[in-house]
């Protein structure tokens, strides 16, 4: 049979099909590894409170959007505040879950070199998450409430 010249893109890890490793061109690429390595959970030398702050800001910022667009107040003038309040509630609930996870999982364990493997580290992470999440939700609310002004600034309307 003639060879078609087709090159298989997804191959077994180290050309051994019995290893069971699912390396794909996407998951094994340098870009993906660099992107995942720069997430706050994997960035070395970052204090737990700063990790929590960064994760919280991102979550607080995007949590309000679904309630603004799809919530029960979506067609009213109160849609933005109707997105802010549930986002704040979700951040508060997630903070409680993070804090209780840290208390339950690391109760009575010896101190570790990794700060996120201790109850104190998780407490700091949860505190940072709370501050960042609340701040992110309020920033998203502010931007939605003042969308006309922000749009004018971005378009350069006020600089003419």
Curated annotation (Swiss-Prot):
The chain crosses the membrane at residues 84-104, 125-145. GO terms for biological process: photosynthesis. SUPFAM superfamilies: Photosystem I reaction center subunit XI, PsaL. It is a multi-pass membrane protein. InterPro entries: PSI_PsaL, PSI_PsaL_sf, PSI_suXI. One of its GO terms (cellular component) is plasma membrane-derived thylakoid membrane. It comes from the Bacteria. Its main location: membrane. It is found in: Cellular thylakoid membrane. Keywords: Membrane, Photosynthesis, Photosystem I, Thylakoid, Transmembrane, Transmembrane helix. Belongs to the PsaL family. NCBIfam families: PRK00704.1-3. This is Photosystem I reaction center subunit XI. The lineage of its organism: Bacteria, Bacillati, Cyanobacteriota, Cyanophyceae, Oscillatoriophycideae.
């Amino acid at each position: 049979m003639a060879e078609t010249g087709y090159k298989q893109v997804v191959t077994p890890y180290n050309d051994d099909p019995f290893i069971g490793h699912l390396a794909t061109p996407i998951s094994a690429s340098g870009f993906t590894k660099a992107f995942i390595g720069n997430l706050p959970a994997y960035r070395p030398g970052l204090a737990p409170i700063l990790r929590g702050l960064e994760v919280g800001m991102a979550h607080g910022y995007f949590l309000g959007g679904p309630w603004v667009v799809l919530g029960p107040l979506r067609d009213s003038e109160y849609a933005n505040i109707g997105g802010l309040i549930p986002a704040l509630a979700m951040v508060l609930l997630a903070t409680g879950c993070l804090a209780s996870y840290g208390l339950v999982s690391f109760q009575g364990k010896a101190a570790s070199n990794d700060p996120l493997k201790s109850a104190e580290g998780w407490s700091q992470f949860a505190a940072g998450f709370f501050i960042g999440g609340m701040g992110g939700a309020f920033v998203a609310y502010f931007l939605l409430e003042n969308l006309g002004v922000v749009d004018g600034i971005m378009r350069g309307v006020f600089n003419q």
